[in-house]
Amino acid sequence: MTELFYSREISPWLGFVICACLGSFLNVVAHRVPRELSVISPGSSCPNCSASIPWMLNIPVLGWLVLKGRAHCCDSRISPRYFIIELLVALVFSGIFFSFTNHQDWCMLLASSAFAWLLIGVVVIDFETMLIPDRFSIGGACAGFVLSLYFPSIHGVHFHPYGLESLQSGYSSLLGILIGSGCLYWIGALAGRAFGREALGEGDVKLLGCIGAFCGCKGAIFSIFGGALTGCLFLIPVYLWQKLRPSASEDNNALAFGQEIPFGPYLALAALGYFFFLKDLINPWFKWMNELVP
C-alpha cells in the first residue's frame, strides 16, 4: 500500500482526491468558523434555502460542475468560490505530494500540508470578513510548535551531536513565534502612532506568530516584507485600473487611500512562498542571525 504514496505517477492523483475533500472541508470551516457555528453538524446545506445536500451532489470539485453552479433544490446560484477553493487545495496538495515522493520525508509532508491548509483558510476568511480566527492563528502557532518538537526536520534539524534535535527545532519554532509576532506588533504600534489610527490588527500579529512557528524567525521576518511587497504588486495595478476606468472607481468596493485592507492574505502568500520555494534563497541573507538561530 505504501508503494502508492511513493509512486510519482500515482501519488499526485491520490493527493488530488484526498485533498479535494480537505478543500471541501475548508469551505465549511471558512463559512462557519467566523459565524461561530459548528463545523461538524448540521451537515452540508444549501446556503439559500437551507435544504440538505445529498452526498452524491456534494462530491468535491465534481459536484459544482455537475450542478453547473446552481443549487439542486431551489436553482439559486452557488458561488464559484466553493469550486475554486476545492480545486486550488487539490492542486496545491497534489504538488506537495509530488515533491515529497523523492525523499519520502513524511514528517515534512504532514507539516507542509497542515501549514498550507491553515494559510489557504486564512486567505479565504480574511478576504471575506477582515478577521483571522484565533483557531487559525493561535491554534496554528500551537500546532506548529508541537509539530516542530515531534518532527525536527521542519526547521532543517536532522542531527544534533547530543541527540537534542527536538529541543533545537522547538527552540527555532518558539523563537519564530516570539520574534515574528513581536516585530509586527511594534511595526503596527509605531505606524498607528504615526498615522493616528490602527495600522495593523491583532489577527495579523497572531498570524505571524503562526508563520514563525512553522518557518522560524527568518521566515517570519521575510513574510512581513514579502507580504507588503505582494500586497503592493496586487493592489497598485488594481488602484491604477480603477483610476483609468471611472466606472470602476464608483464601485462601493473601489480602493481608496485610508481604506482598510486585509494584510493577512499577503502575509500568508509570502509565507507559503518562503516555506515551499524561497527558503534556500532567502536564508543566506540572514547570516547575521546565525548566532541566534542555527
Predicted features along the sequence, with ranges:
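Membrane-proximal soluble regions of multi-pass membrane proteins
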Residues: 26-81, 254-257, 263
